[in-house]
Amino acid sequence: MSGGLVTAAYIVAAILFIFSLAGLSKHETSRQGNNFGIAGMAIALIATIFGPDTGNVGWILLAMVIGGAIGIRLAKKVEMTEMPELVAILHSFVGLAAVLVGFNSYLHHDAGMAPILVNIHLTEVFLGIFIGAVTFTGSVVAFGKLCGKISSKPLMLPNRHKMNLAALVVSFLLLIVFVRTDSVGLQVLALLIMTAIALVFGWHLVASIGGADMPVVVSMLNSYSGWAAAAAGFMLSNDLLIVTGALVGSSGAILSYIMCKAMNRSFISVIAGGFGTDGSSTGDDQEVGEHREITAEETAELLKNSHSVIITPGYGMAVAQAQYPVAEITEKLRARGINVRFGIHPVAGRLPGHMNVLLAEAKVPYDIVLEMDEINDDFADTDTVLVIGANDTVNPAAQDDPKSPIAGMPVLEVWKAQNVIVFKRSMNTGYAGVQNPLFFKENTHMLFGDAKASVDAILKAL
């Protein structure tokens, strides 16, 4: 395949990737967007494999077969509830790939390049390895937090921001040494020291972020992985990799910014680490009143006598796989003429759009799934609210307690409804480790047990 044909294929693939992003932005066109992405990636792979600069095609095809087999295995094995962990670990692979490409590019650069081109190449290598290493360890820590292997509580080291700044300054000085020196030994030493600093830097950035803010972390790491891919594209002189990486990097950054705005948080604090950890309260498990319990049968009667119902799902619904019976309850209540809607918090679940994906999977009509800003004013006129597996996103302490770790975060104001039913396994705190005063309000009743079992019991009673 000639160079011109490869370039043309790359342009087509890049356009398909843009169409893919546009399609994925809406529920109605998401399947079409996914197909555009698959087509673009297929064209990109074929053009790269059979391009004029590619050798050892057999090894590449073998690697593709192995990678494809692993991907198919994961796609069949991983549940929807484990998708955040899968996304995080895939981000780490992108970062690790950028690191390996960087070292390979340094060891096998073209001899006889002009000095200015050599400096540009070395800068590309250095930045590519730095971004890749930060993405790799940051994503591994995010994976550990999401699957419970690492504590979700933020790592609060003294002077952590000064440590982050020092790491950046030292890395910048190492970049100058790496580019300016002619000594191969000194270059390798600078590269290895920077890699070690970047690995620790990435680990510390994510470790210092509170568990409740993991959806923002996932979108932030998505952005980092995009820039790591773009850096690899520069090192490999691959235009499509640069374009694709820039698309992923910018879209991830925009998504992080939108989510931060929705949570009343500073975008810079996400980049710097320590997001959502400024509150002095530790959020202990101490109860702040007496809670009231309710049965599934009583909940069913309450729903039958309601005119308006809002369901606010959280990660607990995902874990229990309760979206299917919830969809059936919605269908039954709507058949009775009851106005049923869903209120989705921007960071409900463990990755952006987590609840929307689960509800779409259960075929809940998309026009009754509303964002927090669209539905918050309606709670006061609502008869019954079902809080299924949500905790921090419906916590009134965000508004009432300035010392709370989640202070200032906009929440779904479910307590304004006439009746609130909270589905929980126990009275334990949520992912942020903060007690929820909602559970002790007079209009709130607790329905304890597995969310799916509770929803099934309500469905049977209906």
Curated annotation (Swiss-Prot):
Could you tell me the Gene Ontology terms of the biological process aspect for this record? NADPH regeneration; proton export across plasma membrane
Q: Which enzyme class? A: translocase
Catalyses: NAD(+) + NADPH + H(+)(in) = NADH + NADP(+) + H(+)(out)
State where the protein is found: Cell inner membrane
Entry's EC annotation = 7.1.1.1
Query: Could you tell me the superkingdom of the organism this chain comes from?
Result: Bacteria
Q: What is its main location?
A: membrane
NCBIfam families, sorted: PRK09444.1 (NF006974)
Q: What subunit structure does UniProt give?
A: Heterodimer of an alpha and a beta chain.
Q: How does it sit in the membrane?
A: Multi-pass membrane protein
Stretches of the chain found on the membrane's Periplasmic side = 1-3, 67-82, 137-164, 210-215, 261-308
**What protein name applies here?**
NAD(P) transhydrogenase subunit beta
Spans through the membrane: 4-24, 46-66, 83-103, 116-136, 165-185, 189-209, 216-236, 240-260, 309-329
| Physiological role | The transhydrogenation between NADH and NADP is coupled to respiration and ATP hydrolysis and functions as a proton pump across the membrane.
Per the record, its GO cellular-component terms are: plasma membrane
| Membrane topology (Cytoplasmic) | 25-45, 104-115, 186-188, 237-239, 330-462
InterPro entries per the record?
DHS-like_NAD/FAD-binding_dom (IPR029035), NADH_DH_b (IPR012136), PNTB-like (IPR034300)
Alphabetized SUPFAM superfamilies for the sequence: DHS-like NAD/FAD-binding domain (SSF52467)
Task: Please name the GO terms that the record assigns under molecular function.
Answer: NADP binding; proton-translocating NAD(P)+ transhydrogenase activity
Similarity comment: Belongs to the PNT beta subunit family.
What UniProt keywords apply to this chain's record, in alphabetical order?
Cell inner membrane, Cell membrane, Membrane, NAD, NADP, Translocase, Transmembrane, Transmembrane helix
